[in-house]
């Protein structure tokens, strides 16, 4: 017989209500032993919870959900009693005296829901993300993922890939006409539509991953431009040593902050210049390592040393070396000394913010700009939440689509195109759990709460 599992569904500690959840074929047996009666599905019962000798341990609401009409898809019993931890522990101990009942693993209720097709893997992950959300925007986005918005987009992509794959494989079955099929433009048109569709989902997923995991913001610039002062201003504390000596920061400094609940990882780096000191050279190389992995770069410029219009010329080598997909915000610091007014403007394709890290004038403008860059919205609108593994799967799918496009347009190789489309389908299906290893499932659900 399949295991019946039990766990506390409410947080450990003192509260108004405490809930124990039981799922599995023995759920009704628990009701008979602890409550003294079988329960009708979906009907709330106010009953005493009894020990083996009939002693009343607590009293409260009991709810029974008959399979498959429950969260896990199994028979489920919920006992809602008083929220004292001692009471809940006594009741849990009582339930575990019943043969065939064991404590649930972390995330096992959600895992059973996934295995019983009550929700897919992306939706299951969204449960944990909703619980862990640190902002209203992240919570709303996690809820959209739980309701299937992300999964629906993936399923639409998979359906499009299957349709095209079927069309291509049908052409392969008629070798005399295969070239005509592959060259008539219809397959390439469908393939281009899938590529555009996938790129749109990738863009949304990247924004969703930033909402969940935080945006990595690297502060870069020349020595003494005020990078460490800006880190301190954003952190709201003296996280970095600040002096007038150029090159004070020689290693990477990291600070984790929240802006209206939105997580950011702020990284202060060594000043970029030609250095003769070996230690400083190492610091500069580490700075570049961080820059190349950034989600956003803040380029600090001393407003007392050059005009705003000159930055593209002065920083041409830096901009050329920077990966093209990383957004850059130019920060003109020390406006308290240069006499410039605080403000934000668009200049030559870059956002430029004038501020003083020392006096904190204009720092709020930067905070609002970073929130916007992360996808913050004060309304109820917004996208779904995503994880890094989702981004990796989407990236893998995009790579196979690109290879498939080459096989089609350059070689008219139907069999190789069909194989690339199969790989695309597998990569996308990993997101929803249609093709997923047991090891991956274990890693995902082990990060959940006990009782979920």
Swiss-Prot record:
GO terms for cellular component: cytosol. InterPro entries: G_TrmE, GTP-bd, GTP-bd_TrmE_N, GTPase_MnmE, MnmE_dom2, MnmE_helical, P-loop_NTPase, Small_GTP-bd. It comes from the Bacteria. It is an enzyme of class 3 (hydrolase). Its cofactor is K(+). It is found in: Cytoplasm. GTP binds at residues 224-229, 243-249, 268-271. CDD domains: trmE, TrmE_N. Keywords: Cytoplasm, GTP-binding, Hydrolase, Magnesium, Metal-binding, Nucleotide-binding, Potassium, tRNA processing. Binds 1 potassium ion per subunit. One of its GO terms (biological process) is tRNA methylation. (6S)-5-formyl-5,6,7,8-tetrahydrofolate binds at residues 21, 78, 118, 452. Coiled coil: none annotated. Its EC number is 3.6.-.-. GO terms for molecular function: GTP binding; GTPase activity; metal ion binding. Residues 214-375 form the TrmE-type G domain. Mg(2+) binds at residues 228, 249. K(+) binds at residues 224, 243, 245, 248. Exhibits a very high intrinsic GTPase hydrolysis rate. Involved in the addition of a carboxymethylaminomethyl (cmnm) group at the wobble position (U34) of certain tRNAs, forming tRNA-cmnm(5)s(2)U34. Homodimer. Heterotetramer of two MnmE and two MnmG subunits. Belongs to the TRAFAC class TrmE-Era-EngA-EngB-Septin-like GTPase superfamily. TrmE GTPase family. NCBIfam families: mnmE_trmE_thdF, PRK05291.1-3, small_GTP. HAMAP family: GTPase_MnmE. This is tRNA modification GTPase MnmE.
